[in-house]
Amino acid sequence: MDDDARRREVSRTLLAEMLPGASFHARCVHCGGEHGRLRVSGADATVSVSYVAGWAFAAAGPAAIALGLDAAPDVEPSLDRVLPGADARSWARVEAVLKADGRGLTVDPMRVLVEDASPAGVDWVARIDDDRPFTGWDVPGPAGVVLAVAARSPS
């Protein structure tokens, strides 16, 4: 089993513990490969997964919300090519929003506007252009990894 398959297996195991009886599948809309947004069958839920540095991370929530999770190495010199001036925390937030939005990197990351939040229990809010906001949280992770979760309730 290659590393990608092993990470997928770990993420599915984590999700199965969170959502007993559910099954998970991914199918790329562009190439048909087993990657891309993970879909849930057998549970009224939505999920998001992310992988970095040998780790697999998973998040689950009610099906009615848009949910995105991203993990990034805390030092990533190549970020400047994708999101000029960004640090790993900024990138994880942007990527979580793009995952929650459902379009991923087909949207220019520069279109995501992130601001510190004032509501209690929320770390940040973000928008893609002038669209409805996503609520965001910075999540503790293992040493060397930053995690961010973005969610948006239905309109």
Model-derived segments and their meaning:
Residues M1-S155:
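Core catalytic alpha/beta fold that binds nucleotide/phospho-ligands
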